[in-house]
């Protein structure tokens, strides 16, 4: 990691907004620019008693890696090893998507991975959403219900989640329908119930999309990343800004949230600042070169961005840092004070 990036990370950690003090980690099936596959036959992933023949490539390969690791409890598996094994499994089956980890804190990716962090000694709660878009003329998926069923079996058998603390939304006619309103309500509920030391797990398997940025004008590429509810035609999609406001911002310090997003364009759907990609170019978590500090600060009512050195704090990418050099660091120090 370059000197300026390291300085930026140190300063950001000192003055990070209170809303990012919770321990938040997200595994996504692909980067923002990529799509995530729906697999018609998951038998090659060798899951124990899979709930069906179809499934999402990300969920299926993650479970494959985790079950194998669980069979040898004497061995440990780091974040790096997890993501690399996922990437290798996906490549072996012909998928080009690159799994990545984003987080609210700069995790040491050589530390042991656990879906429930050891520090999470409180209640274990889970919210799982699987949408096959049953009845739609286009975009019907086959594997999302199976993803949820398989993941529920895993978190119960391996991590001790109890049925009373597991919420499932699926468009199968049996569970609560994953409408826009129901998804928002479910995310709000799991946050409202959470207390320090609790472990939260949120899983989404369905369509993700990129749509034109709303009037906040925050996205560098002009697009928001979204989750696609069953009723998106009538009630719209759930934007990354919405997810941040209802799922990330309200979490209290001491809560441990792990999210699995098995959908297209999911790399930054939670707008978290730190990233590690299993593409061979990362050795540690870095501040995402596409992370927008202006967007983050805007969520906390800091509108006079230029006053605090916006040139250096907009999109922190290599070219920008190279152009402003030492002046950038001065502006960063002035901003974080």
Swiss-Prot record:
Changing residue 202 to S: Severe reduction in catalytic activity. Keywords: Autocatalytic cleavage, Calcium, Disulfide bond, Hydrolase, Metal-binding, Oxidation, Protease, Thiol protease, Zymogen. The active site is at 207, 264. Pfam families: Peptidase_C14. Auto-proteolytic cleavage into a large and a small subunit which probably remain associated by non-covalent bonds. The keyword Disulfide bond applies. Gene3D superfamilies: 3.40.50.12660. One of its GO terms (cellular component) is cytoplasm. Residues 1-6, 116-125, 290-337 form a propeptide. GO terms for biological process: proteolysis. InterPro entries: Caspase-like_dom_sf, Metacaspase, Pept_C14_caspase. It comes from the Eukaryota. Activated by Ca(2+). The modification Cysteine sulfenic acid (-SOH) is found at residue 202. Its EC number is 3.4.22.-. One of its GO terms (molecular function) is metal ion binding. Ca(2+) binds at residues 224, 240-241, 271. Disulfide bonds join 202-259. PANTHER family: METACASPASE-1 (PTHR48104:SF30), METACASPASE-4 (PTHR48104). Belongs to the peptidase C14B family. Cysteine protease that cleaves specifically after arginine residues. This is Metacaspase III c. It comes from Phaeodactylum tricornutum (strain CCAP 1055/1). The lineage of its organism: Eukaryota, Sar, Stramenopiles, Ochrophyta, Bacillariophyta. The gene is MCA-IIIc.
């Amino acid at each position: 990691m370059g000197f300026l990036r390291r300085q930026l990370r140190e300063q950001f950690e000192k003055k990070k907004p209170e809303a990012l003090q919770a321990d938040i980690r997200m595994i996504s099936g692909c980067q923002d620019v990529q799509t995530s596959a729906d697999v018609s036959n998951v038998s090659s992933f060798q899951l124990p008693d899979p709930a069906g023949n179809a499934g999402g490539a990300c969920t299926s390969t993650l479970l494959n890696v985790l079950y194998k690791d669980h069979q040898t409890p004497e061995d440990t598996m780091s974040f790096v090893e997890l993501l690399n094994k996922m990437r290798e499994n996906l490549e072996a089956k012909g998928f080009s998507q690159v799994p990545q980890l984003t987080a609210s804190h700069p995790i040491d990716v050589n530390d042991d991975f656990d879906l429930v962090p050891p520090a999470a000694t409180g209640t274990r709660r889970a919210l799982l959403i699987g949408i096959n878009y049953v009845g739609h003329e286009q975009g019907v998926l086959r594997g999302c219900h199976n993803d949820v069923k398989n993941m529920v079996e895993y978190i119960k058998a391996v991590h001790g989640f109890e049925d009373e603390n597991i919420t499932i939304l699926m468009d199968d006619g049996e569970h609560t329908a994953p409408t826009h309103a129901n998804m928002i309500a479910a995310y709000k509920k799991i946050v409202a119930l959470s207390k320090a030391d609790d472990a939260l797990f949120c899983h989404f398997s369905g369509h993700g999309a990129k749509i034109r940025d709303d009037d906040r004008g925050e996205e560098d590429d002009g697009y928001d990343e979204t989750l696609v509810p069953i009723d998106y035609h009538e009630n719209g999609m759930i934007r990354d800004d919405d997810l941040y406001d209802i799922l990330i911002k309200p979490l209290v310090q001491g809560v441990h949230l792990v999210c699995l997003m098995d959908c297209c364009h999911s790399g930054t759907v939670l707008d978290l600042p730190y990233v590690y990609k299993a593409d061979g170019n990362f050795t540690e978590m870095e501040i995402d070169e596409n992370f927008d500090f202006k967007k983050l600060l805007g969520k906390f009512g800091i509108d006079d961005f230029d006053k605090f050195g916006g040139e250096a704090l907009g999109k922190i990418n290599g070219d920008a840092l190279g152009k402003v050099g030492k002046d950038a660091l001065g502006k960063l120090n002035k901003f974080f004070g």
